[in-house]
């Protein structure tokens, strides 16, 4: 890009508050932050204005170092300043610096900074505290009490006993679950071990009856299997005859006619 004319460069050297913006045809005033075209007539008219005359006379010897260490040059933009108390960027002009330092946000942050210095506590800007609190609230809302699932643990001995007691013995007659103690003779005095009068008189008849019942059950089971087999074969034959296609399709059509 071509450089401005020599008369424009000479005029800019006479007014240090006017700075030429790189890669543009514009000039920025550091006192007001105003941008104007890089042409000599516009620059002369701007410098003759009342606002520029007032600011240039009052801020000709403005000391930016007086606001350090809270306001320092910005590392991102060399034409701006950065406030460490409010984490804000400020235009490098006396008017903007004074407006920021006299504002409520800066004064509140400066008061908190001084209190932290007295107590020996590190100062944290308010915006960082707000972000940190918001992050903690989100983590607490994600992990509500009572919703966290614990790790699996093996059951204790009491729980195992309770599970073992949960049998289905109450659904069956108690005679099936009577236990005979070891080491005792068979002819014990317990009432369960004595035979009734009918069992004592006809033990052989009861054995023959149980044998006959087992034989009848076996024969009935065989008959049931044969009957089911016959029904299955008849069903398969009907299914095959229904879904069987004729070999000659033309003959089938003739029969249909």
Swiss-Prot record:
Residues 177-189, 199-219 have a biased composition (Basic and acidic residues). Residues 220-247 have a biased composition (Basic residues). Disulfide bonds: none annotated. It holds the Pfam family SURF2. Keywords: Phosphoprotein. The modification Phosphoserine is found at residue 93. GO terms for cellular component: nuclear speck; nucleolus; plasma membrane. The modification Phosphothreonine is found at residue 196. Residues 156-168 have a biased composition (Acidic residues). Residues 134-257 are annotated as: Disordered. InterPro entries: Surf2 (IPR008833). Residues 248-257 have a biased composition (Polar residues). PANTHER family: SURFEIT LOCUS PROTEIN 2. Belongs to the SURF2 family. This is Surfeit locus protein 2. It comes from Mus musculus. The gene is Surf2.
């Amino acid at each position: 890009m071509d450089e401005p004319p020599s008369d424009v460069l000479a005029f800019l050297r006479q007014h240090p508050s006017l700075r030429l913006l790189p890669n543009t045809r514009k000039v920025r005033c550091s006192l007001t932050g105003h941008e104007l075209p890089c042409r000599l007539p516009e620059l002369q008219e701007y410098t003759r204005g009342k606002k520029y005359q007032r600011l240039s006379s009052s801020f000709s010897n403005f000391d930016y170092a007086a606001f350090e260490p809270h306001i320092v040059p910005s590392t991102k933009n060399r034409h701006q300043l950065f406030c460490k108390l409010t984490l804000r960027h400020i235009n490098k002009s006396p008017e903007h610096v004074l407006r920021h330092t006299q504002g409520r946000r800066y004064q509140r942050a400066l008061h908190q900074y001084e209190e932290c210095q007295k107590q020996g506590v590190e100062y944290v800007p308010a915006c960082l505290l707000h972000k940190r609190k918001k992050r903690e609230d989100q983590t607490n809302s994600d992990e509500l009490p009572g919703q966290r699932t614990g790790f699996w643990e093996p059951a204790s001995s009491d729980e195992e006993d309770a599970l073992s007691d949960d049998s289905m013995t109450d659904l069956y007659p108690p005679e099936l679950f009577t236990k005979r103690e070891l080491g005792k003779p068979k002819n014990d005095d317990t009432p369960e071990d004595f035979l009734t009068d009918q069992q004592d008189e006809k033990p052989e008849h009861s054995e023959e009856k149980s044998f006959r019942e087992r034989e009848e059950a076996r024969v009935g089971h065989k008959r049931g299997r044969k009957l089911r087999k016959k029904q299955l074969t008849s069903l398969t034959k009907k299914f095959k005859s229904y879904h069987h296609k004729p070999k000659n399709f033309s003959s089938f059509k003739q029969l249909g006619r």
